C-alpha cells in the first residue's frame, strides 16, 4: 500500500497532463452518454448520439490544430463542424467527463492519504442533521439571515476557478477558447430565472459542475472569514477592520501600544453561528447583537461584488429575528415559538409548580408546496382541486389505489414531524377524492354511482386511514410506546424531498 501511495503521489504532479489528450478521445464521449454523472442523472441528447458521430467530431478537432478567430474569416472557421449546436453539445459533455475524472482522482488520492477531506472538516454534516439542528439549536439563537445565492457569475471568474483546480494549462485554454467562441454567457445563464431552472437540460452536466465549483469557491472564502474574523485586531479608535480590506490597511498601520491592540470587540467573537445551504438558498443563524449579522450581510455583498463581480440586489439577503418571523426551508414553514411548560421544583420538604416559557421550533406543512408537488405527480389540478388522472385510467383498480396510497404515504412521512398538519389533511382529502374520480372515470360512471355500485367507500377509507399510514412507519409492536414518547419524527428521504423543495 505504501508503494502504491508513493506511485499515486508521483502521478499526482502528472495526472493533469492527461486531460488534454483525453479531450480528443472518442471513448470519453462514449462515457459521457453511457454512464451517469457524479452531479446528476444521465442526460440524453434527443437520442441522436452515436460513437461514430463523436469519433468524427474528435477527429476534426484533432486535425485542426490552428483556430482562425479573425472577424474577416468567420465564415471559414469550422473548429467543430457545420452543426454547431450538436457538436458543441458533444464537446461540452466530453469536457464534463474529463473534469469529473480529474476530481474523482483528487478524491481518491485524498482518501488514500488518510481521508484528509473528512479530517479537515470535522463539523461536516449531512442533510439528515438539519432537522435535529432546527429542534436542538435553532431555538437558542435569535437572528436569522435568509440568503439567496446570486447569479450569474462571469465566465472568466468561473474559468479562473476551474484553472485553479485543473493545473493543465493547455486543457484550460482550449476549453476557455471554446466557451468564448461558441457561447454567450448571458444566454447560458438567463439572469431572470431561478437557480433550479437556469441550467438547460442539454448542458446540465457541465453547468452543474460549474455552478458547484462557484459555490465551493464562495463557501471556502466564507469559511475563511468565519474562522479569522475574531482574530482581527483594532486600531486605537476601536474600529473593526473589514476582512475585505484588512491586508491593505495593515500596510499603512501606525504602530500603537500593546494595550490598545489588546482590545477586541466582544460581539464579533461569536461561536454560535450556523450556516445551512440547500440548492440556491442558505440560512445564516447566530446568537448575538443585530450589528454582527449586519456585518455578515455586508461581508457577503462585498465578497460577491469584489471577488465574483456579481451585483447583489437588496432582495438577496433578508435579516429577521427568529422569535418574530418565520421562514421556508426544505419544504417546511418553520418558526421558533415560545411554549409554556410546567416544572415541579422541590425546595426542602415542599414542592412547588412553576411555569417556565420554553422555546420550541414549530414546523407547519406548507400548502403551496404540497399542492404543487401533488400537481406535479398528476394527482391534483393546478388550482389544488381534485382531478381524475387520465394517464392512470388504463391501470387496474389495485394499481390506481396503490399509486394514490404511495403518494399519500410520502406526504405523511415527510410532514410527520410538523406540529400543525391542517394543510396536510387538506391535501390528503384532495388525493382521496382524486383517486375516487380516477376510478369512476375508468368505469365510466359518476363518483356517487361508482361508490354505491362497488361499495368502495369502505375500501378507500381503509386505504387512507391514519392508523394504516402510521403502521407503515413503525411496526405494530411499537404502538404501545406512542404514549410514552411523543416526539416528532422527521422523514429523511433525501430523494423524495426534492419534489417539495423544487417548488420554492
Curated annotation (Swiss-Prot):
Any GO BP: tRNA processing
Alphabetized UniProt keyword annotations: Chloroplast, mRNA processing, Plastid, RNA-binding, tRNA processing
Subcellular location(s): the record lists: Plastid, Chloroplast
GO molecular function terms noted in the UniProt entry: RNA binding
Q: Per the record, what is one GO cellular component?
A: chloroplast
Instruction: Please indicate if the UniProt record lists Zinc as a keyword.
Output: no
Family that this chain belongs to: Belongs to the intron maturase 2 family. MatK subfamily.
Write down the HAMAP family for this protein, in alphabetical order.
MatK
Function noted in UniProt: Usually encoded in the trnK tRNA gene intron. Probably assists in splicing its own and other chloroplast group II introns.
Q: What is this protein called?
A: Maturase K
Amino acid at each position: 500500500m505504501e508503494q502504491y501511495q508513493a506511485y499515486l503521489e508521483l502521478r499526482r504532479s502528472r495526472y493533469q497532463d492527461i486531460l488534454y489528450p483525453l479531450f480528443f478521445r472518442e471513448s470519453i464521449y462514449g462515457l459521457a452518454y453511457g454512464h451517469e454523472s457524479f452531479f446528476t442523472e444521465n442526460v440524453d441528447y434527443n437520442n441522436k448520439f452515436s460513437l461514430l458521430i463523436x469519433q468524427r467530431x474528435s477527429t476534426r478537432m484533432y486535425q485542426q490544430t490552428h483556430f482562425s478567430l479573425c472577424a474577416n474569416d468567420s465564415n471559414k472557421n469550422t473548429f467543430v463542424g457545420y452543426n454547431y449546436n450538436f457538436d458543441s453539445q458533444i464537446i461540452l459533455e466530453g469536457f464534463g467527463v474529463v473534469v469529473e475524472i480529474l476530481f474523482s482522482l483528487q478524491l481518491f488520492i485524498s482518501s488514500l492519504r488518510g481521508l484528509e477531506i473528512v479530517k479537515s472538516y470535522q463539523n461536516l454534516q449531512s442533510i439528515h442533521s438539519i432537522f435535529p439542528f432546527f429542534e436542538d439549536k435553532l431555538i437558542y439563537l435569535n437572528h436569522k439571515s435568509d440568503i439567496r445565492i446570486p447569479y450569474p457569475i462571469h465566465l472568466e471568474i468561473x474559468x479562473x476557478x476551474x484553472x485553479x483546480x485543473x493545473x493543465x494549462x493547455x486543457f484550460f485554454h482550449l476549453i476557455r477558447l471554446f466557451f468564448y467562441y461558441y457561447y454567450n454567457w448571458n444566454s447560458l445563464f438567463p439572469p431572470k430565472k431561478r437557480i433550479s431552472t437556469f441550467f438547460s437540460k442539454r448542458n446540465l452536466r457541465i453547468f452543474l459542475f460549474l455552478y458547484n465549483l462557484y459555490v465551493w469557491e464562495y463557501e471556502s472564502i466564507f469559511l475563511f472569514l468565519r474562522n479569522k474574523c475574531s482574530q482581527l485586531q483594532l486600531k486605537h479608535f476601536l474600529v473593526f477592520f473589514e476582512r475585505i480590506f484588512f491586508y491593505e490597511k495593515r500596510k499603512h498601520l501606525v504602530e500603537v501600544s500593546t494595550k490598545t491592540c489588546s482590545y477586541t470587540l466582544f460581539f464579533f467573537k461569536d461561536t454560535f453561528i450556523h450556516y445551512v445551504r440547500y440548492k440556491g438558498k442558505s440560512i445564516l443563524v447566530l446568537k448575538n447583537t443585530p450589528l454582527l449579522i449586519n456585518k455578515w450581510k455586508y461581508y457577503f455583498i462585498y465578497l460577491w461584488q469584489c471577488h465574483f463581480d456579481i451585483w447583489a440586489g437588496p432582495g438577496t439577503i433578508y435579516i429577521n429575528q427568529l422569535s418574530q418571523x418565520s421562514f421556508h426551508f426544505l419544504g417546511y414553514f418553520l418558526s421558533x415559538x415560545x411554549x409554556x411548560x410546567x416544572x415541579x421544583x422541590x425546595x426542602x420538604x415542599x414542592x412547588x409548580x412553576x411555569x417556565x416559557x420554553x422555546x420550541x421550533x414549530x414546523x407547519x406543512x406548507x400548502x403551496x408546496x404540497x399542492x404543487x408537488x401533488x400537481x406535479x405527480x398528476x394527482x391534483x389540478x393546478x388550482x389544488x382541486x381534485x382531478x381524475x388522472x387520465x394517464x392512470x385510467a388504463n391501470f387496474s383498480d389495485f394499481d390506481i389505489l396503490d399509486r394514490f396510497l404511495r403518494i399519500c404515504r410520502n406526504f405523511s412521512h415527510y410532514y410527520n414531524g410538523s406540529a400543525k398538519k391542517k394543510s396536510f389533511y387538506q391535501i390528503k382529502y384532495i388525493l382521496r377524492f382524486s383517486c375516487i374520480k380516477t376510478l369512476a372515470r375508468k368505469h365510466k360512471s359518476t363518483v356517487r354511482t361508482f361508490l354505491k355500485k362497488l361499495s368502495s367507500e369502505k375500501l378507500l377509507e381503509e386505504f387512507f386511514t391514519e392508523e394504516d399510514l402510521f403502521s407503515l412507519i413503525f411496526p405494530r409492536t411499537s404502538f404501545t410506546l406512542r404514549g410514552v414518547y411523543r416526539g416528532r419524527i422527521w422523514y429523511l428521504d433525501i430523494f423524495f424531498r426534492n419534489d417539495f423543495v423544487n417548488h420554492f
